[in-house]
Each structure stands twice: as C-alpha cells, then as structure tokens.
Curated annotation (Swiss-Prot):
PANTHER family: COMPLEMENT C1Q SUBCOMPONENT SUBUNIT B, EMILIN ELASTIN MICROFIBRIL INTERFACE-LOCATED PROTEIN ELASTIN MICROFIBRIL INTERFACER. This is Complement C1q subcomponent subunit B. Residues 96-105 have a biased composition (Gly residues). The modification 4-hydroxyproline is found at residues 35, 38, 41, 53, 56, 65, 83, 86, 101, 104, 107. The modification 5-hydroxylysine is found at residues 59, 62, 77, 92, 98, 110. It is linked to C1q deficiency 2: An autosomal recessive disorder caused by impaired activation of the complement classical pathway. It generally leads to severe immune complex disease characterized by recurrent skin lesions, chronic infections, an increased risk of systemic lupus erythematosus, and glomerulonephritis. The modification Pyrrolidone carboxylic acid is found at residue 28. The keyword Disulfide bond applies. It comes from Homo sapiens (Human). Gene3D superfamilies: 2.60.120.40. Pfam families: C1q (PF00386), Collagen (PF01391). The C1Q subcomplex is inhibited by sulfated molecules, such as triterpenoid sulfates, heparan sulfate, or chondroitin sulfates. It is found in: Secreted; Cell surface. One of its GO terms (biological process) is complement activation, classical pathway.
Length: 253
C-alpha cells in the first residue's frame, strides 16, 4: 500500500537527501590514505590485430643519385628495324679505274637507202713534164698523174670528164718565163671558154695561179687551153700543176 506524501513536504525531503550525500562523500575522503609505491610492470600482453592503413604521406624530396651499376650481359639480337629515310647525297667520290670493254650491243635497225653519189670521192692532181712550146688554142696536157680518185682525169688528153653531176673546184699553178695567159674551158664536143687568167713578165720566172667553182653536168669536160702568150714551163724545179675535186654531188640528178 503506497504512502501518499503531501506536496508541501517535497522540498524538505530533497534538502535532507542532499545533506545525506554530502556526508557520505566526506566520510569517503576521510578514509583515503597516502599514495602507495608503484607496483612491478605486468607481463606484456598479446599483440593486437593490425590497425587500418593510414592515409598516404606527403611525397618526399628526391634522393641522391645512386652509384653506377655493372654492365649487364648483351641481349639477343633483335629483329631488323624499319628502313629509314634516304640520307643526303654525299660528295662526289674519286674516279674509279677504267672498266673492261662491255658486251657488244644488239644490231641497230636497218638504215634508209642512201644515194651512191653522196659517197663519191672524186679528186685529181697532175703535173706537166713536157717542156715543149704550145700552139694557140692547144689543150695543155698535164701528163704526170699524182692523184686520180675514180679516174675522172685522162692524162693523155689533159681533160677532166664529169661522171657525177655536182659542184667542182678547179685550180692550177703554172710556172713560166715571160708572159702567160691560159683559158679555162668547159663543154662536151664543142667546149666554151669560161675565164682567162693572165700574168705578164719579161724574161723572168713567175708562177701564175687561178681557180674556179663550176657546176657540171654528166659528160662535160674541163681543161686548160693555151693562148698566144704561152711561155708555160714543165721541168724539174719549175713545175706546173692542174687539180680539181668534187665539192658537193647533185642529189637531184
């Protein structure tokens, strides 16, 4: 059976309870003596489990370089690499020794047919060894042949006969003692005078020369003809010579 406490007595009861607690604490203090000597440390306990990893620390400063290590052994040969780009052209080297003859090349294509006239070589030179007086209009015969390619000059007649039409050059050098005039003649059966060369001297040795380019047709003759001034000489030390040669053949003939 609960006991009813009047509301007016509650403060008194609280005061009495507080005073009782104070007395109890003072009684406990009065029973406490001086501190004792610390005892011997106990045996270390069993290590506890590892703790959780801590947070990463701040990056430290760079350390000093280490000592150089020993050279390692050579590894196996690797695969060839990709070819690099071509380098720059180097300087020109010295000329090498002369090589041997190469193999003969293949024959070239057949050429076009040529004109036989383009390959003709026609030339003559003849001297006069006959030292006898000449008559007017007489053909001057140069009887000693020096050169006569293709035999277009006839020493027995003293005439050149054209066999290949074209341009020819004729010249003469005549030694004489006194006045000398000669005619350069051309034609077939009836020759015509082309030009007359003259040189005048009285009782003295001289050399007369002359030359001309003529366009000849096949069968025409060319020769020198004497005039009334015909002191021509033909002897050792005073030679007279008649020459001629083909310059260009007539390709249209």
């Amino acid at each position: 059976m609960m006991m009813k406490i009047p509301w007016g007595s509650i403060p008194v009861l609280m005061l009495l309870l507080l005073l009782g607690l104070i007395d109890i604490s003072q009684a406990q203090l009065s029973c406490t003596g001086p501190p004792a000597i610390p005892g011997i440390p106990g045996i270390p306990g069993t290590p506890g489990p590892d703790g959780q990893p801590g947070t990463p620390g701040i990056k430290g400063e760079k350390g000093l370089p280490g000592l150089a290590g020993d050279h390692g052994e050579f590894g196996e040969k690797g695969d060839p690499g990709i070819p690099g780009n071509p380098g720059k052209v180097g300087p020109k080297g010295p000329m090498g020794p002369k090589g041997g003859p190469g193999a003969p090349g293949a024959p070239g294509p057949k050429g076009e047919s040529g004109d036989y006239k383009a390959t003709q070589k026609i030339a003559f030179s003849a001297t006069r060894t006959i030292n006898v007086p000449l008559r007017r209009d007489q053909t001057i015969r140069f009887d000693h042949v020096i050169t006569n390619m293709n035999n277009n000059y006839e020493p027995r007649s003293g005439k050149f006969t054209c066999k290949v039409p074209g341009l020819y050059y004729f010249t003469y050098h005549a030694s004489s003692r006194g006045n000398l005039c000669v005619n350069l003649m051309r034609g077939r059966e009836r020759a015509q005078k082309v030009v007359t060369f003259c040189d005048y001297a009285y009782n003295t040795f001289q050399v007369t020369t002359g030359g001309m380019v003529l366009k000849l047709e096949q069968g025409e003759n060319v020769f020198l003809q004497a005039t009334d001034k015909n002191s021509l000489l033909g002897m050792e030390g005073a030679n007279s010579i008649f020459s001629g040669f083909l310059l260009f053949p007539d390709m249209e003939a």
